[in-house]
Amino acid sequence: MRILISPAKQMIPDPDSLAPVSQPRFLPEAQLLLETLRQKSDRELQSLWKTNDALTAENIQRVRTMDLTRNLTPALFCYHGIQYQYLGPSALEDAPLAWLSEHLRIGSGFYGLLRPLDGIVPYRLEMQARLRVEDSRDLYAFWGDRLARALAEETDTVLDLASREYSRAILDPLPASVRVIRCVFLSRKPDGTLAEKATLCKMARGRMARFLAEAGQADPDTLRAFDGIHWEYAPNLSEPDRLVYLEKPSRPGTRPAFEW
């Protein structure tokens, strides 16, 4: 079993805490992407990133100075988005962290596919960015099926906790022999319909990854047992390869986890 999650835009380097234990598998490809970014003008980079002036200036400085072999932070500890806050890697004990190191994989537009303790530097490049790289029209074309092939070498079952942006690049090209199990987190809207809410899904995916790490397994019974504080498994809405979790109704006098 491998668990796939998305990266986060917010990244904070911390090379002085936990040392990386491995380097990204697709480091040469990342170096090529970096060289491609360095060929862009400041205005072209801002258009590519769709960032404000302050973020653009910060990331231009990164592009101009970054070294993919120095001042590295383990990937799991470098990302600081909502999903990673709810996963809470810095609070994990050794056994759950070791379990994640083996079973968790992080999709990345820049690095391709990362293990939790691969050493990385902060970057800004989403998988959906329209970056032409050599003869490839965008990053989906650039990565092609190589990320799927790398994942298929490791496992015959993938738990999909990634956003569609990354599952499209990594899971869609998988061979039919690899089983993909998707977790869906639904909330009830005021009109009674069920829908995914991006912020809540990020929270739930992070909590799910932590739950599995602390359990030390990701078998069907463990997946169904996940409640994640605000979630409960919905067997009547689920299928073998599509596990649905519903947001629990708020108790009287308390606020919901998220308001529509």
PLM features: residue spans?
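Active-site helix-to-loop segments that bind/position phosphate- or nucleotide-bearing substrates
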Residues: 4-91
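Short hydrophobic beta-strand segments
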Residues: 2-6, 157-160
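Internal, well-folded beta-alpha domain core
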Residues: 89-254, 258-260
